[in-house]
Amino acid sequence: MRVVKREPAVLLVEDEPLLGELMTEALTDKGFQVHAAPDARDALRHLLSGADIDIMFTDIDLGEGMDGATLAQLAHEMRPMLPIIYASGRRSMHEIATVPGSTFLPKPYTLKEVDATIARYLGNDRA
C-alpha cells in the first residue's frame, strides 16, 4: 500500500479581497493547499468542518464582526496544537492577546517572511 502525502494546508483569514487573492496565489504557488476565509465566521466553518489544516494565518483587523485575536482564541480551544500566525498593520504584538505557540508578523510583510514563518512551524524547507 502506498501512502500519499498531502501538501501542507494553510487556513488564510483575510478580509481585504485583493490581499487575500494575492496571498492565496502565492501560497498555492509554493505548494500549499489554501483554505481562504474572508472573515472569522467562515474560518470557524473551516475549522469545524474537520478540514485538514496545518497552520492558520489571520489578519487581526477583520472588519465587521469577530477580530483575528478572538478567532485565534477559539481556534486554539478547538485545535490546541494548531500554529497561528497573526498579521496586522495597525496593532503591535503587545496589544494582542496571543495564544501559545503563535507568532506575529507586522504589515507590510514580505512573502519571504511568510514562507520562513510557516516553514519554521511546519518543519519543512520551503523558504
Label every PLM stretch briefly.
Residues A36-I55:
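Acidic, metal-coordinating helix/loop segments flanking the phosphotransfer/catalytic sites
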Residues G89-M93:
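Negatively charged, flexible loop motifs adjacent to catalytic sites
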Residues M1-L12, P17, K30, R41, ...:
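Non-catalytic signal-transmission and effector/linker regions of two-component phosphorelay proteins
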Residues D67-L82:
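Short amphipathic alpha-helix used as the core "switch/output" element in two-component signaling
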Residues I85-A87:
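Hydrophobic/aromatic residues positioned on beta-strands within the core alpha/beta folds
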Residues D59-I60:
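Active-site residues of response regulator receiver
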Residues E21-D29:
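Charged docking surfaces used in two-component/phosphorelay signaling
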Residues G63-G65:
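The feature encodes the CheY-like receiver
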